[in-house]
Each structure stands twice: as structure tokens, then as C-alpha cells.
UniProtKB/Swiss-Prot annotation:
It comes from the Bacteria. Belongs to the GCKR-like family. MurNAc-6-P etherase subfamily. This is N-acetylmuramic acid 6-phosphate etherase. It comes from Actinobacillus pleuropneumoniae serotype 3 (strain JL03). PANTHER family: GLUCOKINASE REGULATORY PROTEIN (PTHR10088:SF4). One of its GO terms (biological process) is amino sugar catabolic process. The gene is murQ.
Length: 304
């Protein structure tokens, strides 16, 4: 796209418009300024609320993919890419899943997490190549993230995923975007112009984070990675998480600390297994068999 055409396209995007509520921010006190930002931020969850049907549809597709051995793959550039990598990286410690189950890809690779990579988002072919590098297949779900809805790198990835017959989801903050035209499910969080014109790391980025939270949390809950609202699959990899595992077992079973610690020791710090052992009054092997028979879903295993 020529510079003139790009300028024309950007001028039509909501995310690139000037916000009438922040025209004088360079004249405000610190308190006045953060009040303006806070007031604008209040619009974000309301914009996300309007997309709940599409978000739920995406969750159902992700759950189906997980159950069939597929993965959830996020792809984006800049802030959008970083948020995808962030959400993906939180899944293993929170839900005890493989780091391959939810994958985050950012234009420009690992270095782009901390430093801007010139031109990385403009390469359509690289989006496709980066999916090929992680062996993306029809079984996987691709979520393309870009506030503008027009990032070439993400469009290239979405087009490739679609050509394979994989489920494609777009997250953008402009309506009727190029990404939305490609994706099977379009999540358009229309948060309005940013406080700082064009700075989509602000409201648009916050909306993206809320949506990503929903996608992984709801999907993991639906495949049995929690019990009630407890993170029973937590990986107790540090002192804080070991203490959390003890607390989770105590809350789920109403046992005392000693019982929780002793059972966790037998269960090799597996909180879900420890809970199963206590609530079913069974040994480790029997508890493991019960969980396996119900695909790791603790509530279902306990009901039998």
C-alpha cells in the first residue's frame, strides 16, 4: 500500500481518530490527566461486553480443538503480539498444561518482546512462515490480534490458517476490518479513539487483554482444569505456588493443613490428585485411575 493510500486508510479508522475528551491533556495536572484516562478506560469492558457472543463462540471452537489434540495459537505485532505471548506463557503454571498447548507468536520473534523491530508487521509472507515454523495445522485455532484490523503480518497468518481449513478468529478495535473479513469469528472491541491519538496500547490493548483472559480461562475451565473456582492444576514450581497448592487442597476438601501437606507429598504436589484422594478416600493409584477415566475432570470423577 502506498504512503498516500495508507494515510487515507488510517484516517478512517476509529483507533486513529482524535479523542475530543483528551484534547487538552498537555495542560492538565497529574490528577486531572489520570482521571481522563480512567474515564476512558471505563468504556473498555462495555465494549467487550458487546462481543460476548463471539467470544463464547471462539471458546467453543478452542475447547473442541483441545479435545481433538489441537492448539490455540495467538499471533500479532507489537503490543498485540506481546499480549498474546503473555497470555500463552501464563497457561502452563496456571493450568498445568504443556507450553505447546497455547502458543504466542509475535512479529519479529523473541527480540520484538522488548524492542521494536522495524517493518516486522508489514511482511504478509512472514505471518504465514511463522505459522509454518510451529507446524500449524487444520486441528489448531488461530487468533489474529491487531487493534487496526489491517496488520499485513496478521492478515498473512489468517489467510494461511484459513487455507488449511483451521478455525480463525480476529480481535480488532475497528469495525469491518480486513481481518474480520477473513476470520471465521470476528471479535470487534470498539473502544473508541485513544486518549493519546493512535496509541492502541491503551484502550485497545486493554480490551485485547480482557478478551484473551476470557478465551484461555473459559476454555481451560471447560476442559476440566479447575474445580469450583480453584486452580487445581496449578504447577507448584515455587514457594508461593506450593503454599497456594496447600491452600487449594484445604479449601476444596475442608481438611487441615497437616492433611493437605501430607497428601500433597504423596501426590507429588499434584493438587487435583490430592483433592481426589481426600474426597474419595482413596489411595494415589485409585485416584489417578478415577481421574483418567473422566479425562481429568475432578467434579465428574467425584460424582461416580
Amino acid at each position: 500500500m502506498s504512503e498516500k493510500n495508507l494515510l487515507t486508510a488510517l484516517s478512517k479508522m476509529i483507533t486513529e481518530q482524535r479523542n475530543p475528551n483528551s484534547m487538552n491533556i498537555d495542560q492538565l495536572s497529574a490528577l486531572e490527566l489520570v482521571k481522563v484516562i480512567n474515564q476512558e478506560d471505563k468504556q473498555v469492558p462495555l465494549a467487550v461486553e458487546k462481543c460476548l457472543a463471539q467470544i463464547a463462540q471462539a471458546v467453543e471452537k478452542i475447547v473442541q480443538a483441545f479435545q481433538n489434540g489441537g492448539r490455540l495459537v495467538y499471533i500479532g505485532a507489537g503490543t498485540s503480539g506481546r499480549l498474546g505471548v503473555l497470555d500463552a506463557s501464563e497457561c502452563p503454571p496456571t493450568y498445568g498444561v504443556s507450553s505447546e498447548m497455547v502458543v504466542g507468536i509475535i512479529a519479529g520473534g523473541e527480540r520484538a518482546l522488548r524492542h521494536p523491530i522495524e517493518g516486522a508487521e508489514d511482511n504478509t509472507e512472514q505471518g504465514k512462515a511463522d505459522l509454518q515454523a510451529v507446524n500449524f495445522s487444520q486441528k489448531d485455532v488461530l487468533v489474529g490480534i491487531a487493534a487496526s484490523g489491517r496488520t499485513p503480518y496478521v492478515i498473512g497468518a489468517l489467510e494461511y490458517a484459513k487455507s488449511l481449513g483451521a478455525t480463525t478468529v480476529s480481535i480488532a478495535s475497528n469495525p469491518n476490518s480486513a481481518m474480520a473479513q477473513i476470520a471465521e469469528i470476528a471479535i470487534d472491541t470498539i473502544v473508541g479513539p485513544e486518549v493519546l491519538t493512535g496509541s492502541s496500547r491503551m484502550k485497545s490493548g486493554t480490551a485485547q487483554k480482557l478478551v484473551l483472559n476470557m478465551l484461555t480461562t473459559a476454555s481451560m475451565v471447560m476442559i476440566g482444569k479447575c474445580y469450583s473456582n480453584l486452580m487445581v492444576n496449578v504447577q507448584a514450581s515455587n514457594e508461593k505456588l506450593k503454599a497456594r497448592a496447600i491452600k487449594i487442597v484445604m479449601e476444596a476438601t475442608e481438611c487441615d493443613r497437616t492433611v493437605a501437606e501430607n497428601t500433597l507429598k504423596i501426590a507429588e504436589n499434584n493438587a487435583k490428585l490430592a483433592i481426589m484422594m481426600i474426597l474419595s478416600d482413596s489411595d494415589k493409584t485409585t485416584a489417578e485411575q478415577l481421574l483418567a477415566a473422566h479425562h481429568g475432570k475432578l467434579r465428574q470423577a467425584l460424582a461416580k
